[in-house]
Each structure stands twice: as C-alpha cells, then as structure tokens.
C-alpha cells in the first residue's frame, strides 16, 4: 500500500495526462468518425486533399517528391510550399500500412492530425513545467486537449494539414529550448559539453528544424528566440539570466536546426519565406552567428571590457543594441531582397483587399463591418481566453517581482502570438497553446490560494488544514473554465468538413468522362522538373486543358478529378479585372461573354465548374478579388427582402425603406449587374444567354431541397416560392440567413420581379443542382436572313439534365443589316448526359423554324445557313 501511495505521489501527473489523452481521442477521433468514414473516406477542408495528392505521388516515387506541380495553377504550375515533414510522415505511414492510394491511403492520413492533436499535450506540459511548475503543467496539458475552435478543427480526424504540426513543433521548440537553458544555467562550459548536457540543445535544434520542415515560414521561431536573448541582455540589470549559457544553448540549437533543414534548402529558385529555399537556411545560420556574437559580448562583459572603455554597466546592453542595429542595416544594404523577405512576414498581420475575404485571414477581433467583437475569442478558446488573459497579466506582475528569464521569454512569445492573432484569425491555432498555458497558471494559483491542492494532498494521506468553502469555490472556478470550453469543443468536433457528396460525385464523373483520362492519371503520378520561373506556361508532354472554378475547389479538382485547375487555395490563378489579369475572379465576374472568352482563351479553359456557394455567398469574395477592395464589390448587390407585419413579402432598396417592425431577411439581393455576370448566367440561368458554354453534368440538389422534394413539387413555381419564403422568414426570426438552395430560389424570384423584362432571359423559379459542370465549345454558328422589320432573333430549346431536371435554354441576338447570327452550344447527339430533348426553335417575328444540331457542328464551329 505504501509503495502504491509513494508511486502515485511521484507519478500522479501521468494519470491526468492519460485522462487528457482519452478526452482528446474522444473529441478528435470518435466524435467526427461518421463524417469522415462515410460514402467515401472524406478528408476535411481543402489543403488536406493537396497533401493527399503529394503523398500519393511521393509513395509512387519514394523517396523522391515533387517540389513543382504543373497540375495546378494551370497552365503555369505552382512551386510547392507544403513541407517535407508531413509529406514523408504520410508517405511512410501509407507504405507501412500498405495503403498507397485512394480510399485506403486517405483512411491512414485521416488519423495523422488527430494523433498530432492528442500528442500536443506533451510539449504543452513540457513548456509549462519549465516556466512554471509541474502542477500548472498538468493543468495546461489537460486544457490543450479541450480547447475548441481552430486548434481543435485543425487537429481533428480527416484534417491532414500541417497546421497542427506547426503548433506542435513550435511549442516543442520553445519547451526544449527552455529545458536546455534550465539544464545548462549555472554550470561551466566543461560540464555542459558532456554528452548528456549537449543532448538538450541538440533536441531543441531538431524540434526547430522539424518546425521549419512542417511550415517553411517556421523560421519565425529564430527571431522569437533572438528576442528572448535581446531582452535578456538589454535588461541585464533587471532580468535574472545566465546570459553566457543562454547564448551557447542558442548557438547549438540554431546550428543543429540548420543541419536538419539543409537537405531541403534548395528546392526553390531564389529566396522565399514560404518555399523551401536558402532563405530559411541563412536565417538559421545567421541566428547561430548572432547568438555567438551575444556570447562574445557577454565574455567581454565578464572581463570588464566595457568598464575599461568607460561605458560602465550600460556598455553591454548598448553593445547588443548597436549589434542588432548593425545587423539589420547590413541586411538592407548588402541583401535588400533578403531583408524584404524577412519583413514580408509582418504583412501577415495586415491582410488587405481580396485576402480579407479568406475566412482564416480576416482580423480576429473584428466583424466584417469593422466592429470589435469577442465572439471569436469564445468560439475558438471558450472560457480559456479570459482565464488566459488573466494568467498573462498575473505572469507579467510576477515577472516584475521575480525577474525570471523563462517567464519573460514566455511572455514575449505570448505577446507575439497575440499580435499574430489580432491580424489573422488563422493564428488561433497557435494562440490555443498560449490560452492553455496561461489559463493553467491562473487556475494553479487559484487552486493554491483556495486550498484545492491541499484537499487533493489530503486525499492521499496528507493532513493539511483547509477551508472547505475555499475548496468549493476553487471547484466552481475550475468548472467555469472547463465545462463551457469542453461543451464548445464537443459540439464543434462532430463534423470534419471536406467536399460534400455532390462535389465528390461531380469530380468523380469528371475524371471518368472527360477526355484523356488515362494520360492525366499517368501524368498525375510522375515527377516533374522544377523550372527557374513559372511566369510562362509550362511545357506539358501532351495536349492539355484547364478547369476553371473558384480557388477554394482547386485541390479537390486536382486530387479527385485528376484534372488541372486554374485557381487553387494557394490563391494562385485568381486574377482580377482592375489590372486585366486573367483568372477565376475575372472570369466569373465578367459582365459579358466576350470578356470571359478573353480570359478563357488566355488560360486554355475547357471546363467550368460552378456550385451554389459561388452563385450565392462566395460571389462576394469573387467580386472583391476581381475589383480589388471590399467597397468596390458592393455594386453587385442591391436591396433586401422583408416580411411586413401585415403578412406581405416585399423588396426594399435599402433598410431605411423597410416598414417598421418588419422581419428583414438577412440576405443581400443582387443588383442588375450581378445577373449579367458569367456566374449568374452559368449557375442561375443554367447557361442561357451564352454561346460557348453548355452544361454537361449536374449534381443532386442541395440537401435541404432534396428533403423538401418529398413534400413539394419542384416543378411547381408557386409551391417552390412559398416554401422558400417560409424558410427564409422562419430563419430570419433568429437572425439566420436562408439556406443556399433557398438563396438561389430567392435570387431567381428577385430577378423575375426586377430585371427579367429588361434582360430578356426567362428563368424558372426552382432549385437546381449543387454543382454544375460546363464545357467550353466553339458552338454551331447558325446564320441567315430575316424580314426587313425584324430587329432580333430568339432561340430556345428544352434541356434535360442527368438529374432529370428540365430547363429552357434561351438566347437572343440582334439583327444587323437584315442578317442574324447565333452560336449554339448544345448538340442533340452529344455523348454527355445533359442535352436538348426538343429541337432548337428559332424565331424571327412571326416566323419560327426548328433545327437539330450535331456534335461535330458544335465542336468544329460549323456554319449553318438558315433563312427566316
């Protein structure tokens, strides 16, 4: 019994760590299981699919991997900034489990981020223990397991991205660096050069190296550690630090990290902060040299050099400041590109223009209206944000009293992470560790002051005096920190994201039914040369074509369809209209087909993929990228729908025109300009009004309208509209926007009421497929003479999709000099499942003629004479 009690006293923390790990497994693996292992093995988000692509290619070519990918950002190709750590970790795991492609490989990869999230309790424990104590460390390890928000979402089953490993290795680097410092401080050089002592900074160097190999911009840990040293030297009279051993630990750490990075340092032509280039190597080596210079300054200080030259105690801090200024100045003079790259890191906290439409880039504490909010703080950290802030303030107060170097270092890190968080909400997954560590400090102090630790000690045999009232209060505070945080995490962990079935089915169809599938599948697994520049189109070994969609979907198109997307989630291929740059934004927001054709011709577009999100919510992002700034996108939007107290549904140009006490539908209705864009004509109008684009595939309906279809006739416009209005009003009562399928219906309703007569393209008020694929074709050219009094010619045909939905294709052209010319994209004998089920009806005045178009005529742009 005594042995068991003794063991528990010594290793009690292990039981808490095991409990934390089990809770983490529940949140990260068990909760989202059914959303990942479903109709396929569904990886989350976008970037995990690109890792899947890289890992599949690496397994095929092991141990070689690609550093340039001509399969994306077509036709130029992209340099690959996804680091080797996760690529090789996933490849080795796939090889070990004989899962080298497809669903079996994705099943293995799905567990990697969750494992990283579970293991994160260890570096958080280490870091907290080295700065505070074991009790706070155990609490921090428990808290990091239940932090909700970005950290949870990026360490959940299926989300195989490097983000969890960024956070993991950054905290590991800080923890092992401070561990090395704590083990070295107070010892002479001969003792610290022993194998056991040297192991500490070597391990720290390995963790920094792995951090950079997980994320190319991970070199930022070097200036953070140098900042630790800078303040330790500048505040030498205040901070209690063993500066000599601190400098030596840094020298060894940076040297080892440079060696770890060295094999991957030359995979990009030039310097870059994100691609694997010599830049990171120079930062790490330069940091080692700077640390060595700090060591030399401290040696001079020890022998009284600064006193002898008349500088006194201010000499050493002054020397450090001068050295820092000289180094920065030399960088700007000798290598301005290097310095510019270094300073570019600062821009991550000041996103502008289109970048502000990226969800993970938007400033953390502000709404899109510019209002300050703490909503994100609650969603991403639960109660731990507030406990963490209290912990930071307490730590700052305690530092002023104790003057501890590790505590100062941790505060510098916390401040740096807070600044990053302020600028971009994506850095919430970094700040999670800050909130856990400092919440643990705050709770540990509370537990100590309120006798909870005494009560726990009494439970295993101690006889401490305590106040049960205090203990109860401590438990209440613990509950306030833990319970709401866990409840949030539990609610957020049930869904892992990723492509829905409509998207997956559409891209699987594309892979199997668009030209040259075998060539693309073979080329997908090859190694590619890395060009010196990607400013010019890549030289492909066979005739290729591009697929244009919004950048969110580029990785899915590449990984699932094995086709070449023009835009991708690296924000490549987006383009703009203000500088006339061909790309996805300039294509989809094009206000006429001729401009869209200019873009498509430049980028060799063959297929267009649109979804209901691009048609509705994501259109705003496309407009901002195209126009260059948030306010400039407003021209695509008009007024609002409302439900009045008298029970009528109305439209108002502004909120000021809405009757008092009305329910405002939280949905901006598009302006006339929107309805003239390519995105509207493709998805909303099903291609009506277009000459060179035809639908070839339609996915199933959005989920909500698929469920409505059991009670509503989707061909009955009145029933569809009433259902949409009812849903919109019911959701508006709670301030919630209509579902996307309903937004489409309301967009169509607004068009019929406001703009249809002027624009002349009839639209049926009905939902349609979530994803649509269009083919760009030359089109059959039908031309002929008309009567003298005819000013326009209209064409229509009924089209039936693979979902058995029918719609009317319409096009109207002007008559010039008694002659009309219309280009028709659909053929009646197409191999694609979407095709006309009636002849084209061509009408000029009172004359109507029918015509059947053949696939060869559409593909070759043949001219057909038909006088009216």
Swiss-Prot record:
It is found in: Cell membrane. The record marks 47, 360, 618 as: Interacts with target acceptor peptide in protein substrate. Its cofactor is Mg(2+); Mn(2+); Zn(2+). A motif (WWDYG motif) lies at residues 550-554. Mn(2+) binds at residues 47, 161, 163. NCBIfam families: archaeo_STT3. This is Dolichyl-phosphooligosaccharide-protein glycotransferase 3. It comes from Archaeoglobus fulgidus (strain ATCC 49558 / DSM 4304 / JCM 9628 / NBRC 100126 / VC-16).
